[in-house]
């Protein structure tokens, strides 16, 4: 990211919250490991929380910048390029560039390749635990490549870097009051969750993440910290376990 955020644009805070003063903000490019490699030295854990829900061409359809037919054809294409080089084959000092001719940021590039690149650097730096914010499932309105690239990242990280304790957090839809547009979407998703629950989860195949319980972003963050503090937590962490980890952290903080 670009360092300390502009708080009014990303949260309900008009000024920097108190906790942010304890954070050492760094400017780096996830696709250029040399820009953050030194920050990994001595780190106990690394968290990858970047990703895209909609690709640029899909947004273009919604904003009218691209024709619906052309945009949707590209958005739902079976395959797209990730980086211009496999992150596992990247040479020291080499940056990863978008593999699409128009420089598009694709699911393959952001959801998969950037995570693998970061995990590789973390492993080489001796980091003990790596956490990847994945997803519970896809959704009918999203291209299948959204969830496929998430699962590909999980698979590659777990198989290529077994020395690290790899944790894959799989939440459903994330919401927060600071992002007003997420609130009505969370309400709709919660309705889907209730409907799916009443059928014993039999609608999961149809609804995907739309049938999972939406979670507040802060709750997921607490679960991430708790998972990295517990050496027994590894592999995929589903919605129910995310809630359990967050509740455990809450109870401990109340003592």
Locate the predicted segments by residue.
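Conserved Class I SAM-dependent methyltransferase catalytic core
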Residues: 115-123, 127-135
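Short, flexible active-site loops
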Residues: 97-103, 129-142
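Oxidoreductase cofactor-interface core, primarily capturing Rossmann-like NAD(P)-dependent enzymes
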Residues: 125, 138-254
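Short, polar loop motifs at secondary-structure junctions
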Residues: 1-5
């Amino acid at each position: 990211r670009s360092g300390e955020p502009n708080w009014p644009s990303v949260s309900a805070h008009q000024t920097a919250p108190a906790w942010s003063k304890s954070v050492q903000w760094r400017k780096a490019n996830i696709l250029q490991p040399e820009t953050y490699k030194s920050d990994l030295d001595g780190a106990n854990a690394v968290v990858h929380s970047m990703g895209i829900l909609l690709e640029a061409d899909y947004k273009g359809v919604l904003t009218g910048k691209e024709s619906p037919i052309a945009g949707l054809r590209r958005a739902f294409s079976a395959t797209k390029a990730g980086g211009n080089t496999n992150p596992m084959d990247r040479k020291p000092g080499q940056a990863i560039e978008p593999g699409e001719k128009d420089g598009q940021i694709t699911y393959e590039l952001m959801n998969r390749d950037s995570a693998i690149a970061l995990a590789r650097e973390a492993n080489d730096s001796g980091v003990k635990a790596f956490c990847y914010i994945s997803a519970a499932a896809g959704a009918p309105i999203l291209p299948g490549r959204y969830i496929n690239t998430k699962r590909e990242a999980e698979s590659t990280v777990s198989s290529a870097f077994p020395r690290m304790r790899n944790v894959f957090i799989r939440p459903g839809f994330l919401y927060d009051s600071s992002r007003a547009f997420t609130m009505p979407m969370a309400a709709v998703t919660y309705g889907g969750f209730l409907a799916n629950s009443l059928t014993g989860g039999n609608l999961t195949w149809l609804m995907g993440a739309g049938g999972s319980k939406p979670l507040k972003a802060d709750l997921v963050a607490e679960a991430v910290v708790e998972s990295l503090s517990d050496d027994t937590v590894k592999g995929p962490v589903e919605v129910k376990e995310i809630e359990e980890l967050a509740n455990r952290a809450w109870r401990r903080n109340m003592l």
